[in-house]
Amino acid sequence: VEGGRLRGAVTRADLLRHTYQDLLKRPTFPAAGERELGEPVARNVAALLANRLPPRIQSLLRSAGTVGDEVGTKVYAVGGFVRDLLLRQENLDVDLVVEGDGIAFAEALGRRLEANVTSHRTFGTAILTLPDGFKMDVATARTEYYEYPAALPTVEHSSIKMDLYRRDFTINTLAVCLNADRYGELLDFFGGQQDLRDKTLRIIHNLSFVEDPTRILRAARFEVRFGFHLGRHAEQLAMNAVQMGLLEKVAGIRLTTELQLILQEARPFAILQRLDQLGVLAAIHPRLTLGSDMEQRFQRVGEVLTWYGLLYQEPSAASWIVYLLTLFGELRGAESRAILRRLNPPPRIATKVNWDLARLRALARQFQQARELPHSRVYRWLVDASLESILALMARMEQPEVRKAIGDFLTTRRQVRPILRGNDLQALGIRPGPIYRDILNSLLYARLDGHVQSRDDELRFVRRRFAKVLPVGEDGGEMSTGDRRARKSEG
């Protein structure tokens, strides 16, 4: 303000640029400049929608467009759904963005589809759950700004163009209109199609990694998943953001979310290796490192998870936990706990990981020191361990006989039960009590080791091993059921 008149304005972006001007100094890379915002590249992908999507998904998209026309709003499919459509990769996670009242649109679409609608009015978002369990996300077109680097965003309603502008990479800024008069029209404001063809990950503006440093982790994930590469300029900005300590300001739970997504990918080690190159792992915690044999360990985990998946057994394993146990497995307890404190996962996850790591380390020592591995011993060691820790152990152990013993436990031994039950022991005249547990466990171990096979074998085993708790007749023999009834009637 000068002389009572407004001469200009300083925006949030101006302040961030001034604060982080060193980070934003652009290296002189040829042909690496960013494209200017402009009108979208014209293209219609209705035929691609028809050829690539199941009829049911096409019907849902058509219904969304029809409802949009009825309530007077423009409706778009956006994000990874559109990106993967153009890449000819299957992705049925439908995300819709509405220019207007997204909640009102979601409720109207929910009525048409007989879907349950869960709304979050603060953010202008909703989740539609169809009767068969299929889900669609609906969001009001919005823009975001960040009060400070690495902060959570503040949200305001906006246009589809500004909604796409807030996204991480140009390949995720593509949108397809679903309204009847424009069905299949592809919006590409930021050159996302060209970047898909060039296999390049490009940020939309220079402050992208300042606003949200977790985008660096997503960049590595997308690089490996799609075989893409960060543009040289974007890579330099990512490394600058790491060196300036911006990741240290990110809430741990957000890092946990990104790490979980990474460990659920097909090639998690390659992503971690890329993050290590960018300095991200050390920025999260100095002890978060990749040992010389970690790649081989991750490869074995992948093989073990594939093997277990082919068994079609319940329960299923949380694969990312198995990889996390492997990543932390060689650390001391205090070190892994320190990293978990930085990541700050939900308490249930933190407790599980700490417990599983302790069990994994103890089991590894036991198996390494064991000279013999009878099935009963393996059962006693593993029966109380989580599935994830057992699979991590199987991948960790190199001795074939140990891996086979663990595999036998998972495939058959853990389901073994003795034939006799408590009522059978009672029929033998054994008084109910803690002794039942001892007897049944002994029977189980004997069956696991092949010492008993039939019901008669188990009866003989009990009479021989637990003779002291069996009632005896006056001749020193075991009492029959008739003898016990007679004695009871005499009493």
Range-by-range predicted roles:
Residues V1-G491:
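Catalytic cores of the polymerase beta-like nucleotidyltransferase superfamily
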